[in-house]
Amino acid sequence: MSELFVQRLTVLDFSYLDVERGLVGESWQADIVLQGDLDAQGMVLDFGDVKKITKKLIDEQFDHKLLVPESSPAFQQASECLTFTFNHGKKIIHCAPDDAVTLIHADTITPETVSRQIIDTLMPLMPSNVLSIQIHLWPEKISGAFYHYSHGLKLHCGNCQRIAHGHRSRIEILRNGERDNELEAHWATRWRDIYIGTREDLIDETDGDYRFAYTSAQGAFALQLPKSDCYLIDTESTVENIAQHLADALKHEHPEDDFQVRAFEGVDKGAIGRA
């Protein structure tokens, strides 16, 4: 039996629900190994077909989505809305078109449970000579500060318009031209497992919750979650606006200093803000 591998086939940028952490933005890189017999070309599968079949499926069914552990007792589904109750008693209510959510056949979301579902979904699409698939999902190795955030971009023409998708992101802050690790750690802590919401999309609030809603090209979206898990900004939560928001906030707090912020959106991409 022969083996074929592709490292960093794609990156999944998504959010998921966890009974302890709440709504978590995440970014996982995907490696794949195909095991099987050689075909008439002397290949397990042509690399072009690997990307066409596997990357396409992963991107369509798992990327830029809300992943929900459907076996968790915290999960309840009613029509287009789902409710997920956290261990601390608070809850999230998410309403969206079906394409914005993927139910994972497990009680928790982990690289292993998601990998298993990707494999189960992929195998029926493989040619008969492919006998098994291995998927390795892994987060970027980050030595410095990072945070997990979720958001939705109602004006985006692609899947970023989904109200609860997210990223695991590095942050780099230059203060007068020098890295400031303390400020990086401060914002990473402040934005740990945060939902960055646009004030314009905030349609209601109670003592404990915010409710965001908008209609975009893909349909109607709504999200209710604890205020303590949210951070409000005045603009769309694009990475360009996030980077500039951070730079402006730092300048406001330290007006005598100059700042450059590199805010990442997942792996190896992002924007720069200056103030």
Which residue stretches match the model-derived regions?
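Charge-rich, low-complexity N-terminal segments
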Residues: M1-A275
